[in-house]
Curated annotation (Swiss-Prot):
GO BP: defense response to virus; maintenance of CRISPR repeat elements
Enzyme class: hydrolase
PANTHER family per UniProt: CRISPR-ASSOCIATED ENDORIBONUCLEASE CAS2 (PTHR34405), CRISPR-ASSOCIATED ENDORIBONUCLEASE CAS2 3 (PTHR34405:SF3)
Listed SUPFAM superfamilies: TTP0101/SSO1404-like
Cofactor: Mg(2+)
Protein name as catalogued: CRISPR-associated endoribonuclease Cas2 1
InterPro entries: CRISPR_associated_Cas2, Virulence_VapD/CRISPR_Cas2
Gene: cas2-1
Length: 93
């Protein structure tokens, strides 16, 4: 199943942890938006990890939209800006 995940996290350290976690499950398409194509077991695993990181009392918000194949085919992209920077480490040898 295809999932669109967006978040609004005010604490930098926690926001970076969530972004890094989501990078392991999908592709960043906007600064705080990821697309993830996951089987149910992987989705459940991701949800458990996200539940442990999200802090309701600190105003964290995360939304997960499940998109069917038909809906996915109707995604529109407007603009061709550069992809968001990733926090991946780069090693020069």
């Amino acid at each position: 199943m295809f999932y669109l995940i967006s978040y609004d996290i005010s604490v930098d350290q926690r926001r970076l942890k969530i972004a890094k976690l989501l990078e392991g499950y999908g592709q960043r398409v906007l600064e705080s938006v990821f697309e993830c194509d996951l089987e149910l077991p992987a989705y459940r695993q991701l949800r458990q990890k996200l539940n442990r990181l999200i802090k309701d009392e600190e105003g964290d918000r995360l939304r997960i939209y499940r998109l069917c194949a038909s809906c996915r085919e109707q995604i529109e992209i407007i603009g061709d800006g550069p992809p968001p920077e990733t926090s991946q480490d780069i090693y020069i040898i």
